[in-house]
């Protein structure tokens, strides 16, 4: 049967107890849903300030995401290594992995913080934004980058929590952080009383303050949870574990970096259409993320379970779990993206009353139906391959696809053929389809069974 569902496939016995797909999925979903909800609230508030401010913060955020990809290399690597070792019952090597990831992540983020804060404006000029938008984007980016060690440690420590089966910790901390950030943004934008932070720079400082408070909570949890980490036994040679972490994390990081750079280039292409096009993309992206987040949450949950299963050599269960979750994700993505298209105009009207933005935005929501259906393949198949330790193949496919399908055809369809944002969205659908289908057949080939770390 096409939609038969076997709950036992999503159940894994680990040293931390019995883990189920539901137990892992709900915290993943809540964390990303709440984070995006707060981002939507912030965008909603920022739109009252000006559409230019939305464009500036959105452009800087796009570049920031590219920088944060360096940190995801460590987070992804340590997650795969920990899942495989925990699944195999090899606890003694987990402390070395955690210790190495934290030390290397702190050092890397310190270097990036210095470089990016110095070269903030040149980085923003690469996005083809000008005038006040460029000034605000450079200011926002510089302030955020001065404290980029905060998201670096978030990514790494949250990956550690999730690998040990404690994703709910990330949910609570993320919720608190985003509520604090939204409250501070409200004070900055609406100034209900004289507040010392103002404008786009104030928004950037709000982000840093809320992340700083959250980091304190994260560090406390790291040392109070029953992770059985023996940091006092660590020696300089323990840092050699970073080689294993980078070996499995780097291909995924290169893939993510390539994707984020391509998205940055695409944003630059969209900027050629006009500033309103950037604002439209940001408004639409805020809405479609609520479809995106379901598939991504299920994909990340599947990756975690498959990592544990591969560590325990339960390959048949991992294989069937992937195919089952793929069906669920495609069904959910198709249904939700169609509903979003049907109710697109009133939802977009919450952000702007500009008739041109509303017209283009509604058209994009139609094309996004196809994007989300094929994105379902990517979320499940790519994350499953990475969870199994098969990281090189997805990297190659992703790099080839995002630059030929997404970037090249965004320029051809959007600029040369004059289709604007609609052309870019068609290119996005082509990219998702090419990657998703390739990942699917890679999983069916079962070559990933030979890629387990332990």
What are these regions (language model features)?
Residues 75, 144-163, 170-181, 203-218, ...:
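Short runs within selected transmembrane alpha-helices of multi-pass transporters and secretion channels
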Residues 33, 37-55, 124-131, 187-198, ...:
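Helix-terminus/linker motif at the lipid-water interface of multi-pass membrane proteins
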Residues 23-42, 143, 177, 210-214, ...:
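Transmembrane helical elements of multi-pass membrane transporters/channels
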Residues 46-65, 132-136, 200-202, 241-248, ...:
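Interfacial/gating helices of multi-pass transporter permease domains
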Residues 116, 159, 185, 189, ...:
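Structural signal for membrane-spanning alpha-helices in multi-pass inner-membrane proteins
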Residues 43, 54-114, 151-170, 267, ...:
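Small-residue-rich hydrophobic transmembrane alpha-helices
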